[in-house]
Amino acid sequence: MASLMRKAAVAPAKATRTTVKASASLQRVAQAAGVAVAGFSLALSANAANVKLGADSGALVFEPATVTIKAGDSVTWTNNAGFPHNIVFDEDAVPAGVNADALSHDDYLNAPGESYTAKFDTAGEYGYFCEPHQGAGMVGKVIVQ
């Protein structure tokens, strides 16, 4: 009977050690998850906004027409239809000292899925348009805070 009591006394000690190990493992998993979430947040901020060239309905618009980002972030425009589109920044509608031509993508994005990305370092408002569809109202704005 004494040997049974010793075994019973030893068993809880093993369970306690297992609990400590499980707790340490859970702590490592939580830390790894925190690092993964932080990395994902940084990846999202590096490409802060996405704009469709042409609406799902087929309308000749930038969707959304206005995006707001932080200085240092980027905007990606993706052709959503088979129409040729481009992104032209108006030199009179960008902050002083910003080269509108350097931001613009004059070449046409012809196929669905083709994209262009620009990075914005200077705060202010940036007006742009699609050259072949400006008359149809295909204009947009990037607001950089």
From Swiss-Prot:
This is Plastocyanin, chloroplastic. Cu cation binds at H85, C130, H133, M138. It comes from Tetradesmus obliquus (Green alga). Its cofactor is Cu(2+). The gene is PETE. The keyword Ribonucleoprotein does not apply. GO terms for molecular function: copper ion binding; electron transporter, transferring electrons from cytochrome b6/f complex of photosystem II activity. Pfam families: Copper-bind (PF00127). Residues 49-145 form the Plastocyanin-like domain. It is a peripheral membrane protein. Belongs to the plastocyanin family. Residues 1-48 form a transit peptide.
